[in-house]
Amino acid sequence: MDFSKFLAEDFDVKEWINAAFRAGPKEAAAGKADSHAATLVMKLQLFIQEVNHAVEETSHQALQNMPKVLRDVEALKQEASFLKEQMILVKEDIKKFEQDTSQSMQVLVEIDQVKSRMQLAAESLQEADKWSTLSADIEETFKTQDIAVISAKLTGMQNSLMMLVDTPDYSEKCVHLEALKNRLEALASPQIVAAFTSQSIDQSKMFVKVFSEIDRMPQLLAYYYKCHKVQLLAAWQELCQTDLPLDRQLTGLYDALLGAWHAQIQWASQVFKNPHDVVTVLLIQTLGALVPSLPVCLSSGVERAGPELELVKLLEFYDATAHFAKGLEMALLPHAYEQNLVKVMELVDAVYGPYKPYQLKYGDMEEKYLLIQFSEVPLEHGEVIDCVQELSHSVNKLFGLSSAAVDRCIRFTSGLGTCGLLTALKSLFAKYVSDFTSTLHSIRKKYRLDDIPLNSLFQEDWTAFQNSIRIIATCGELLRQCGDFEQQLANRILSTAGKYLSDSFSPRSLTGFQDSILTDKKSSAKNPWQEYNYLQKDSPAEYGSLMEILYTLKEKGSSNHHLLSASRSALTRLNQQAHQLAFDSVFLRIKQQLLLIPKMDSWNTAGIGETLTDDLPTFSLTPLEYISNIGQYIMSLPLNLEPFVTQEDSALELALHAGKLPFPPEQGDELPELDNMADNWLGSIARATMQTYCDAILQIPELTPHSTKQLATDIDYLINVMDALGLQPSRTLQNIVMLLKAKPEDYRQVSKGLPRRLATTVATMRSVDY
């Protein structure tokens, strides 16, 4: 039987009994289940007895083992207590040993100090004796003229002197030793010069060793610099005596310096410990010792060029220098970790320093150059058509000059001259706007827009208007190119000079400005050639202004700036003047007719209608010639304004939207024409006509009954013309015609609600009691 299932967690009695019966003998299935059950019960009872016996035996063994475990625990406890006592005793022994040892060590330390002092005293006595011995032998040694032996003696004396610092005659010994070193240097100087001149590596190494041991390396390097500097200075003087232009002379000098750099680096690397520093100082000293000096050469070269070309010539010289600087930068780049950055910065200053005075006054030079260049762009010509054409051509010339100025600023100052550039550009734009304005005034005079001849015949001439439209298109091109140029200017300034802006800079904050200076000094250590900054030290005010410009561009974005806001406003005013010119050229003919109205004799002269009857119907009257001319002229306006609608000219469209027309719509009027520029112009001219017409009518001194009807007829005609063009007649014009048509006896009633001054004036003209 399988009794293991009794141990299962999911044991089920019924399932086990059923399984036992299924697994039983066949007799159980044949009906002898009772006997099989009795067998199972008997087996279970036997199994229970076995289990009880096993449990009893296990319990008995456990009871027997318990006293032994308790005895073991007690023994372990006693051993732990004994161990604790032993550890306390050991701890006390250690403490006692430490006390005894510290006293012994203190004695040993004192003994060692005494020993050290005695050794030092012994060494001092030995060195003093050695100094005396060497001093006595040095004269004999000098007679041998053996530099190595003399150097060894002097080195020994120098070492001895270091031990004699506290002796009374120490200073005298120092002076004596320096005098001996000077004698050695004087003795060796011819050989030193010969070694450096012939580029003898072995001899040069020997002298480096000797002079290093006697602490005279600066003096040895002075011989090196002098030997090679003489050769380079002679090459420069030879170049200066040629007929070559200065930029070619500079190129020759820089080629010689760069060649010397590469040759000397290769040689010095085998002789000196810090060859790059040595050759860097050689170039610095050479550039500073040139005769004639570079500042003098630049000054004379600029003066010879004259005011017209001084900036151009200066840039030619600067290009040669910048090319040399780039060559040096590339030569130094592979050995950046070996360089003394302070020396490299001194070299950068020596290379670019001669240009600093010109860079600081770059703005003035640029302004002068731009104005001279622009003086060759005349806008004024005899014929109007030539003026218009020159104005159109001048746009590209203006922005060509401006873009070239930006190129020069970046090329010559790396963006540090931005403030001067902006000033120069403002002067250029101011000069351009002034000349453009003068040309517009000249065109007005040629068309006699400000001096209307009243006695001239009425005739349509649209030439002036067409030319004015071309000028408006030119203004639009000016505004468009100005916006593009300003965007490009901001981007180029930020990309070029932005490297000088410190992250800690805060506008109008002294602390931020000082932090930015420190940060810039740190950043200059990265690459002095790229971070050269002449402005920060020599013109801090201008540098602060530049930082504010860069900060604004960076914070607000290069598209949201006001670098040329004054110039842009001036160009907008030019566009407004061009609009006024175009408007006046159209309105001139109308105004010419309207100004005749107050002076017409027909208003106070009795006509045929007066002699017949006052009750003639108004349709029997026809508009007078002056109003007929005006009406026909206005009706022809849409045809001549058509270019505004049909011409696809983005510049013209820009200018038209930027400009403002005179005689804006009255408040409360519907403005359907605003969506169409041609209708906008037509509306403005119509309003100008009606307002001027009203002003002219109110200046008529007297009206007869007949002329009153005639004037009302003329006004009705003009109103019909306006209706035909889809335009609203002005309220003033409607009020006047209403007052003119009113019968004398109804005048007071009709005038109610109308402006009192208007009603009084019309009543006076009609001689109506009011």
Swiss-Prot record:
Keywords: Golgi apparatus, Membrane, Protein transport, Transport
TM regions (residue ranges): none
One GO process term, biological-process aspect: retrograde vesicle-mediated transport, Golgi to endoplasmic reticulum
Subcellular location(s) of the protein: Golgi apparatus membrane
One cellular-component annotation, GO: Golgi transport complex
Keyword set includes DNA repair: no
Subunit organization: Component of the conserved oligomeric Golgi complex which is composed of eight different subunits and is required for normal Golgi morphology and localization.
Family that this chain belongs to: Belongs to the COG7 family.
Protein name according to UniProt: Conserved oligomeric Golgi complex subunit 7
Source organism of this protein record: Bos taurus (Bovine)
Encoding gene, per UniProt annotation: COG7
